[in-house]
């Protein structure tokens, strides 16, 4: 084990704990300050990912042995980091050898206080029960909506399995056959997902070659769920589409692909900074049919339009993203879910006013909570009888809860994608 990956992980945890950003985001910031090898960066990301899952288990274990007042931050962080990884199954080899390498690499920055506590690392041998690695409220919540057995499997699955990488080909810049040929020449395996044509599972041993295609705008990485949502909506060339809460623009681009760059997409987001980033990305991907508007969608939108299709992908608790960003499990609280639910209802209501008669609106979140999904749709349908929930033409995933059978739920352990909710609504009159 290269000690540089552990040292890099420690350096990333300081801004993470000081500012509240995720360890993976902090790693990105820290790594820009010094040149690291791809191997070191990959290992550091793996260490921080595992730490985010098991740090609560490691912390409880260490609290039973060491008083927090007796140990400095660096020593505590090193112990928690290595303990978390041992619990999570990362093989560091001989701990004595690892510590010796760390001591040598850190030099004068090595905390002497740590020496008397190193023995605890050799005592860790049992992996805790899965509930310890999640807040109790979250495990109980999942048991309530999924049942105890499915909830336990779901939680264990997303901590054990590496999320797959999905991509679509940017046919707005190059023909599909040519992109596939370029990928093959670079030993990038693109295996088409048999559930929906046009989305690929990416297997690339040469990450530099993959990055090269991405830097050319020929391939874009995104989750299966985003592609599925756009496919359900079925945007067509020459249609008028409204994309609400659109940044960073993944669904905007996927919609433009379906429309073959013909028609109009009006993208709305509350953040001018995100809008500027989205405009830059759309230009890079050769999307030519997007008009952008800065507006707060929790208030009536500053437009007088009735459009063919509306995409509503509001801010959410991101409970469906925990398998990609395990740090989220420790920062999401029930109060956040209630807050998001209220915000989502306002955004959905304001967006729905711009659907023409016979038009469609798709509502989606990367959350698996009922409050942000089924409750929002139930409340909306109750006060908007001119809309109805319709069955999607592509039946993937599970049916919605609370008798909303036409809605769709996706889960990592059953659908190998982010946890996701989708509801397709049609305006009848």
Residue ranges and their predicted role:
Residues 1-429:
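S-adenosylmethionine
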